[in-house]
């Protein structure tokens, strides 16, 4: 009980990835620029989809929710990082750290599950086009998204509650960008074997199951596309999946760089990979999804024209 009280009343120091004032200034402007680009890109995606009735389809419904998740994700971490880079007070309360961790886990999980649902949408559209309207009905889309949210909220709550049973002692200095589960476990002075086992087991289920589902879906999609006789139709089918594959590759690639390693080897060198998945991935997603998408180009153009159109 004393350990719990000690943890509840303590603070952590988010020291970031550099203590050099010159480097901190560079990092501040870099992260601020990336944050603004991320917010602008994802807000434009949401506005374009919501304002264009031609984009009111399951694929764009899930894309808008993915953009919302990415927007929430960077807002959970980057503003605090920017404050720490400009301030001498780098403290974050125990409750604040747990709150940041909860949203971090929940939103990464939600991103992962939405990507899996988007793969299912592409599978039905290409492999079972005659059943697409019934298989991806509005009611089912809302149900799938609700399940994604429910599971993400539960998983974030589970890991956060488990961490409340951990006792922290000694210097509570986090040489990292934000409160991360692996980093916090390294600061613990109580036995973390059970929570580490739960973390690995649930993490494998939550992330590898959707990855396996997406891999299976795309194997079947590729087989179906290769059977299409028309070269132009093949290209169109591949192009509808290319952006999703790009986002999935970036998402899982950066997560693997950070988390597919033993806890005791987790060190400062992983900060670059963390920046990739925590900042770069949400920033790049809008560009990847709209790069070769003519429908998105048109919708974004109409949104921008309305925003900058002078009132008569």
UniProtKB/Swiss-Prot annotation:
Residues 1-25, 80-100, 159-196, 261-271 are extracellular. The chain crosses the membrane at residues 26-49, 58-79, 101-120, 141-158, 197-220, 238-260, 272-291. Disulfide bonds join 97-189. GO terms for biological process: signal transduction. It is found in: Cell membrane. Its main location: membrane. One of its GO terms (molecular function) is olfactory receptor activity. The keyword Cell membrane applies. CDD domains: 7tmA_OR1_7-like (cd15918). GO terms for cellular component: plasma membrane. Belongs to the G-protein coupled receptor 1 family. This is Olfactory receptor 1D5. It comes from Pan troglodytes (Chimpanzee). The gene is OR1D5.
């Amino acid at each position: 009980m004393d350990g719990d009280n000690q943890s509840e009343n303590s603070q952590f120091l988010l020291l970031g990835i550099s203590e050099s004032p010159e480097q901190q200034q560079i990092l501040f402007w870099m992260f601020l620029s990336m944050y603004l680009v991320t917010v602008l890109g994802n807000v434009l995606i949401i506005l374009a989809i919501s304002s264009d009735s031609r984009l009111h389809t399951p694929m764009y419904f899930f894309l808008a929710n993915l953009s919302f998740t990415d927007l929430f994700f960077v807002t959970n971490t980057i503003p605090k990082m920017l404050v720490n880079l400009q301030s001498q007070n780098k403290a974050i309360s125990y409750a604040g750290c747990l709150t940041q961790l909860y949203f971090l886990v929940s939103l990464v999980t939600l991103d992962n599950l939405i990507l899996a649902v988007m793969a299912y949408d592409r599978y039905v559209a290409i492999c079972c086009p005659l059943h697409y309207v019934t298989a991806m009905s509005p009611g089912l889309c809302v149900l799938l998204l609700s399940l994604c949210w429910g599971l993400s909220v539960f998983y974030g709550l589970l890991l956060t509650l488990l961490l409340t049973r951990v006792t922290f002692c000694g210097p509570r200095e986090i040489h990292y960008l934000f409160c991360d589960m692996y980093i916090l476990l390294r600061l613990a002075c109580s036995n973390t074997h059970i929570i580490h086992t739960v973390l690995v087991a649930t993490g494998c289920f939550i992330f590898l199951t959707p990855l396996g589902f997406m891999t299976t879906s795309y194997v079947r999609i590729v087989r179906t596309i290769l059977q299409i006789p028309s070269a132009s139709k093949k290209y169109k089918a591949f192009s509808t999946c290319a952006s999703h594959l790009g986002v999935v590759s970036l998402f899982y690639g950066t997560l693997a760089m950070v988390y597919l390693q033993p806890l005791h080897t987790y060190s400062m060198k992983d900060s670059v990979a963390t920046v990739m998945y925590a900042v770069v991935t949400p920033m790049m997603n809008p560009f990847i999804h709209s790069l070769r998408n003519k429908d998105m180009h048109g919708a974004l153009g109409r949104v921008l024209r309305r925003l900058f159109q002078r009132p008569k």
